[in-house]
Amino acid sequence: MKKKYIMGNWKMNMLPDEAAKYMEGINRLTTMLKGKEDVRKIVLFVPSVDYYIANLMKEEQIYVGLQNMYFKEKGAYTGEISYEMVKALNAEHVLVGHSERREIFKEDDSIINEKVKAGLNNGIKVVLCVGESEKTYNEGKTKEFVENQIVKALEGVSKENISNEEDLIIAYEPIWAIGTGKVCSSDDADNMCKVIRDKVKEILDIDVPVLYGGSVNEQNSNEILLKENIDGVLVGGASLDPEKFAKIIYSGHKLGE
């Protein structure tokens, strides 16, 4: 059975006491996955203020990552979290390039590229988010746009900095499908995940896991996860409810198949 990556992004949600209650629930609901990381890997990207309690309470079948990281070691960068701080917390995974970081906080391709390199050069597993706007999608330019995002994000990256397939994961999240209730068709998502995998292979000569994100929920996750070229999902709103998130975790091929 092919391994699936189930990742949740809490965004700016959950106070520490809420995070603690959540972790109790998700631990209980995923107990049967202990020792089964070869078929399901669960990662929760939490706000930095929740990291301590979430990481303290998590059981072995769950990983906790951070939603952002700056590419400088230290300095006068008010409000930022350096890659050294991420390492000091033993946070193995970090999100880079999410559309909300690109759009709201004006992170351009050069900043995304620096973050990718900082992560990979310092032993942090990078989940790189890419995806097109609704305008780009309607103009039929999705493939060209996303391939260009990947080229720019991976400029100067060497496969020597990638020791295993989990060091670099790409999440395809069409912007028009994030938090809107609109869902990219599973066939289109499958095709784009193949496009992305092929582009990374062309650039780095390695195969990387490619996930889909964008209004993923417990109703559509099964269809998405059964697609050949989709290695997992990056879940937003539905990851805030441990019951719903657990249903997504168990979607797709049943364990043992």
Which residues fall in each region the model found?
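Active-site loop-to-helix "anion-binding N-cap" substructures in soluble metabolic enzymes
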Residues: M1-E257
